[in-house]
Amino acid sequence: MDIKSVAVLGAGAVGSYIIQGLANKPGITLGVVATGERAQRLGQGCKINNKIYHPQVWSPKEAHNVDLLVVALKYGALAGALEDIKTIAGENTTVISLMNGVDSEETIASVIGPEKMLYSLIKIASHKEQDEYVFDLESTIGIILGEPQAPFDSIRVKAIEKLFAETNIHYRVTEHIREEIWSKFRLNVTNNLPQAILGAGIGCYRDSQHMKFISKALRHELESIALAKGIDMSLAKKALGTGVSVPPSARYSTLQDL
């Protein structure tokens, strides 16, 4: 199995990471899925890290039966995009969802079938400057993916490894993808949400004992919920530091969106 065509649904920060990584991959047809005014705007190019990329722009029907569909939407947009995803996903399509939360795979599988879903997540720090998405490629942890059950070294996992090989897309394969997804969800809940409510930089977790308490309490509650669902987050690989200093004023994605 070789992946020759890739469609990206959602050309924000996450979609931009995929676009810039695959734009110059030999033998790959790359497109973004959009309609109406958004399609016209994307047709003018995607500005990423001070460079403009020009992936093809496809309607959902034009993207039908691509080899790989990357869903990179904001979570609130998923419900409204399910019909488009259903249109795009053909008999030979593999779908990965790089969305926050813990149930996007199940939601998408409800309309296209679970056999088309390959579980995944992404860890990326980015920000937007006017019409441009900016991120540090070297420090980006990238995509974590895996089959939810054996065989973990499936044909499609190997195909995606081959797709990402010799690109600047960082990735790793895991046998504990559900635990990894919940582990990222834990980070989002315990770090993103308190900061977003107060509008404070990430230095608040170092400077305020009250913020530390709130974060730890949320962590405990989320871990209790996960265990009740049979998710053992101790199986998730601990993220390695990138060595990049983060200023106390830095904002996680939730606060950036607000």
What are these regions (language model features)?
Residues G230-L258:
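C-terminal active-site/capping subdomain that shapes the small-molecule cofactor and substrate pocket
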Residues I3-K4, D67, I141:
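Nucleotide donor/acceptor-binding cores
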Residues A7, T29-G31, I96, L118, ...:
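A structural signal for isolated positions on well-ordered beta-strands in alpha/beta enzyme cores
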Residues G36-E37, V102, L121-S126, Q149, ...:
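Glycine-rich beta-alpha junction loops
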Residues M1-H54:
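NAD(P)+-binding Rossmann beta1-loop-alpha1 motif at the extreme N-terminus of oxidoreductases
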Residues V32, Q56-S59, L145:
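Generic preference for hydrophobic
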Residues I18, T87-I88, V111-K116, Y133-A239:
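Internal alpha-helical scaffold of NAD(P)-dependent oxidoreductase catalytic cores
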Residues N49-V134:
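Rossmann-like NAD(P)(H) cofactor-binding subdomain of soluble oxidoreductases
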